[in-house]
Amino acid sequence: FVAMILLIHLWRDLHFYLIHRLIHFEPLYKLAHKTHHRNINPGPWSGLAMHPIEHIFYFSCALLYLFFPFHPAFIIVTLVHAGLSPAPGHTGFERIKTDEQTSFDIDSYAHYLHHKYFECNYADGILPLDRWFGTLHDGSEESFNKMRARLSKKNQGEFSAKT
């Protein structure tokens, strides 16, 4: 059961990153994900403000349960988590402070930058997928310049492929 909990988090991280990159593919972006990105300065409700097609992609992580045996309680917990986790990820705050000594990281600043620049910070979890795939933007000028260079190179490739 403990191994399942660890594996499901890794699966959800990888699934979210790949689906998020997929829906940034121009035809899917225009059809569905553009609705979500109307929230340039997102708030908690922005997380689930998605086109129905995007909801299908997002919750397709549950397809795993059709092929592998999981305890029903585990399935319920992970689906509830999938439904509620977009809210804290869209608050725009990096930490929640409960008192003078206690605070916890909610990592939503990276997703705020994703809504601001669109072409970075696709991941949303414990795996450093944005770092591994070169899409991390930490808010620094250096990250901004790397993102611009990556986009410029991508756009040049698209231009030369069209000519």
Placement of each model-derived feature along the sequence:
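Alpha-helical transmembrane segments of multi-pass membrane proteins
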Residues: 5-16, 77-86
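Transmembrane alpha-helix/helix-exit interface in multi-pass inner-membrane proteins
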Residues: 10-30
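Cytosolic/stromal cytosol-facing helical appendages immediately following the last transmembrane segment
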Residues: 25-163
